[in-house]
């Protein structure tokens, strides 16, 4: 059984027991989160596709970790002008483990 959920502007294919890195959620480590925006639920040959969401479906997951990705460095320069700038960015993420898919 698997489902496609929508969170943080992205879509993820998840199954029970899967660990997924999603955009930062406002939840403490060890707490449970519920994803109500379920686009598709498949259980063998039984496939439910939402229009746009599946009614009554939800995915329950446990927050494993809050963290930041590796740093992405951006460097801009203008030749012959002695002008340059260097920026760094670390995107925050939340690692969740899917516990239950209800449809």
UniProtKB/Swiss-Prot annotation:
Molecular function GO labels: rRNA binding; structural constituent of ribosome
Gene Ontology cellular component list: cytoplasm; ribonucleoprotein complex; ribosome
Protein keywords: Ribonucleoprotein, Ribosomal protein, RNA-binding, rRNA-binding
Gene Ontology terms describing biological process: translation
Superkingdom classification of source: Bacteria
Pfam families: Ribosomal_L21p
Coiled coil: none
Record's function text: This protein binds to 23S rRNA in the presence of protein L20.
HAMAP family the record matches: Ribosomal_bL21 (MF_01363)
NCBIfam families: L21
Family affiliation: Belongs to the bacterial ribosomal protein bL21 family.
Assembly behavior: Part of the 50S ribosomal subunit. Contacts protein L20.
Protein's recorded name: Large ribosomal subunit protein bL21
Gene name of this polypeptide: rplU
